[in-house]
């Protein structure tokens, strides 16, 4: 099997993290070299930036500052972890990537998708995923899931009002339309077992 850069996207509470935790052992059993990582984060520098981005008390953070911090974390994560893994023929499963910035900062924050895309083109040197799975869910459903997850730490973005989260979903749907050649929309409001089966099939079809 060959390596592949796969990103998992979706609004808050869409089940990205749970999905990736289930995909990892599945592909390991198939003797596919596989690695799971996340954005912002995945390596020390980017995890430190994540801490800054998620601090609840930093409500004064300006939208451009936010976008640039995400891009900085993305750059370091890409060159330090993702690219070396792809060179070693790994299947890389990444929780969020550039599409999150387009939906959250580009659309929901109002910076403009084209501007945010250009920032990230500079950061990534046009290194894009081969496949993106977008987990679509109504904001009310996703936020309700978060509310029931006692073990999940509430971050700054979780504290935004419902109108912000609705804009995030609207932004994602525009991103899906814009990059339909690499993004597959999957309904996240279904039992996790069915969701895993559907996503496994999509990834395996791409690996062949």
From Swiss-Prot:
Annotated PROSITE patterns: THYMIDYLATE_KINASE (PS01331)
InterPro entries xrefs: P-loop_NTPase, Thymidylate_kin-like_dom, Thymidylate_kin_CS, Thymidylate_kinase
GO annotation terms (biological process): dTDP biosynthetic process; dTTP biosynthetic process; dUDP biosynthetic process
Annotated residues for binding of ATP: 10-17
EC number: 2.7.4.9
GO molecular function terms attached to this record: ATP binding; dTMP kinase activity
Keywords of this entry: ATP-binding, Kinase, Nucleotide biosynthesis, Nucleotide-binding, Transferase
Entry GO terms, CC: cytosol
Enzymatic reactions: dTMP + ATP = dTDP + ADP
Domain of life: Bacteria
Xref: CDD domains: TMPK (cd01672)
Coiled coil: none
Family note: Belongs to the thymidylate kinase family.
PANTHER family registered for this protein in UniProt: THYMIDYLATE KINASE, UMP-CMP KINASE 2, MITOCHONDRIAL
Task of the protein: Phosphorylation of dTMP to form dTDP in both de novo and salvage pathways of dTTP synthesis.
Designated name of the protein: Thymidylate kinase
Organism of derivation: Bacillus mycoides (strain KBAB4)
Species lineage: Bacteria, Bacillati, Bacillota, Bacilli, Bacillales
